[in-house]
């Protein structure tokens, strides 16, 4: 699942930085599957987009996988925004 998420995001968004964190072990009742993920996506594709539009871009890239994931947390930053927090 993690590799599929990475592949879909990389094919649809020009990612300068991409982290996918499987947070499933922190949530009971979901053992053995990737059910909760945190995505940190850094891309200039987000430049000029508000938070909702950024998340829509991420969800569109994952549209064929969303039904298999219980919860997705998204951090979406432009390269300049990311430089300001790292």
Q: PLM features: residue spans?
A:
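N-proximal, solvent-exposed amphipathic alpha-helical segments enriched in charged/polar residues
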Residues: 1-21
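Short amphipathic alpha-helices in soluble, non-transmembrane regions
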Residues: 9, 52-58
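Short edge beta-strands and adjacent turn/loop segments
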Residues: 16-37
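Solvent-exposed beta-strand sheet faces enriched in polar/charged residues
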Residues: 21, 40-42, 73-77
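Short, flexible active-site-adjacent loop segments at beta-strand->alpha-helix junctions, enriched
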Residues: 24, 45, 78-80
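Secondary-structure boundary/capping motif
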Residues: 31, 49-50, 78
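C-terminal structural segments of small proteins and small subunits
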Residues: 57-86
